[in-house]
Structure formats: structure tokens, C-alpha cells
Design a protein with these regions (language model features):
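Beta-strand-turn-beta hairpins that frame and shape the catalytic cleft
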Residues: 153, 194-199
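Short acidic low-complexity segments
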Residues: 42-53
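Short, surface-exposed beta-strand/loop micro-motifs that present aromatic residues
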Residues: 187-194
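Acyltransferase
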Residues: 10, 198-225
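Pocket-forming structural segment of enzyme catalytic cores
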Residues: 103-183
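Extreme N-terminal starter segment of soluble prokaryotic enzymes
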Residues: 14-19
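Short acidic/histidine-rich motifs immediately flanking catalytic phosphotransfer sites
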Residues: 51-61
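Cysteine-nucleophile active-site neighborhood
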Residues: 63-135
Length: 225
């Protein structure tokens, strides 16, 4: 799986302490390297205390939804995510790490409960060619933090066969709705979500070269702070 180049930079201000949650899934070292390149102090660990106390928590994920949820449950991941968000502490999900934030995943008729941070179902995309593997543009909403400063034709690296095909959260005038970014591979699917302290991307920023580095830098600066 190719990784585009990402230039090393010095992150301005205080260094953010980031934990990449090690629950047996995900491109842990790729995520660690990408975050270090944009100036973060990164620890890869399953330790609950470290995950709760970090400035930001990254939840990566590759493979099957059910396997990722089993790994998360084994390290008390859903509780860690809940506790962080209750305190307004940033969490970033990547690829299947985004998918498990939804209510449920359905793979080959097997249904698995997710972390239920957002309503919705992860299911197989209706595309002629799967997996969706390679570079693709996204359609980010006005006001996006993650994609600030990036052109509309910027491409990100995807590799997945399943995704969120419908956004199911009802709009409420009482709260600010999440910002949802879309991409298309045979049909539209959710490419990213920005919801206060909770952010997620279906694509791999750690494998998306300078574009992915910009997304991670925006997250560190404007969400983690």
C-alpha cells in the first residue's frame, strides 16, 4: 500500500501529547510517524490512563468491523472514548476506526454493535469494483476544520469495501450538527465527520502524503489545540 511523501515540520507552540490506541488493529506505526512529522509527541499504547490523559487520542483501524470492535472491547476502548468525549477531549478515528464510531456494522450478514457515537450503519458499498483502493477527492462542507486550506481537487488515499452510505442523525436546532464530508465510489459515502471533540476520516491521512499531513496538522492545531 503506497504512502505519499510527507515533509517534516516543526509544530508551533506547545507540543501536543497524542496517544495512538493499540488494540491489535490499524496502521499504528504509520499513524505514529505521520503524527510525529507534523510535530506531535506520540505514544502507541493500550494503557487506559495514558489514553485518557493525552491531549488527543487516535483510534486507527483496518480489516473487519467485528474484529476491530472485539479488539476495542478487549482494551475498554468504547469506555475510553466515552470518557474522553464527556470531558471534551479530542478523539480522531481513522478508516475502520471511524466506522466503529457508528451504531453498527453489517458484514456478510453479520451484525456487530459499534461504539454508537453516531447513528448509522456501516455496510458494503454498492460499487462495481471493490475494494475502493486508491486516491480520491472529497466534498467538504463550508466551515470544515480538517480540510481548511485544501483545494477541492485534493486527493486522499482510501482502501475499504464498507462504509457509511447514509447520514442518519436528525438535524436539531438545539445543537450544532456535525460537519459531514462525502466522497464517491460508485455511490456517495461518508469520508469524514467533524463533531466537536470527535473527528473521523474514512481515508488514511497517514498514507495521504502532504494532503494527509495537512489534515492531521489542522486537527492538532484547531481541535486538539
Amino acid at each position: 500500500m503506497p504512502e505519499g511523501p510527507a515533509s517534516a515540520v516543526t509544530y508551533p507552540g506547545d507540543v501536543s501529547r497524542i496517544v495512538v490506541l493499540d488494540y491489535g488493529s490499524g496502521n499504528l506505526r504509520s499513524a505514529e510517524r505521520a503524527l510525529r512529522r507534523v510535530g506531535a509527541d506520540v505514544t502507541v499504547t493500550a494503557d487506559r490512563h495514558a489514553a485518557l490523559e493525552a491531549d488527543g487520542l487516535v483510534v486507527p483501524g483496518v480489516g473487519a468491523f467485528a474484529a476491530c470492535m472485539a479488539g476495542l472491547n478487549a482494551v475498554d476502548g468504547p469506555s475510553i472514548i466515552d470518557h474522553r468525549l464527556a470531558g471534551g477531549r479530542p478523539v480522531l478515528g481513522i478508516c475502520v476506526g471511524m466506522q466503529v464510531l457508528f451504531d453498527r456494522g453489517v458484514e456478510w450478514d453479520e451484525r456487530t454493535d459499534g461504539c454508537a457515537q453516531w447513528p448509522g450503519t456501516v455496510e458494503r458499498l454498492k460499487a462495481d469494483v471493490l475494494p475502493h483502493m486508491g486516491w480520491n477527492t472529497v466534498s467538504a462542507p463550508v466551515g470544515s476544520t480538517l480540510f481548511a486550506g485544501l483545494d477541492a481537487d485534493t486527493r486522499f488515499y482510501f482502501v475499504h469495501s464498507f462504509g457509511v452510505r447514509r447520514w442518519e442523525m436528525e438535524v436539531s436546532t438545539a445543537i450544532r450538527p456535525p460537519l459531514v464530508t462525502w466522497a464517491n465510489h460508485g455511490e456517495d459515502f461518508v469520508a469524514a465527520v467533524e463533531n466537536g471533540a470527535l473527528s473521523a476520516t474514512q481515508f488514511h491521512p497517514e498514507k495521504s502524503g502532504d494532503a494527509g499531513a495537512a489534515v492531521l496538522r489542522n486537527w492538532l492545531r484547531d481541535v486538539v489545540g
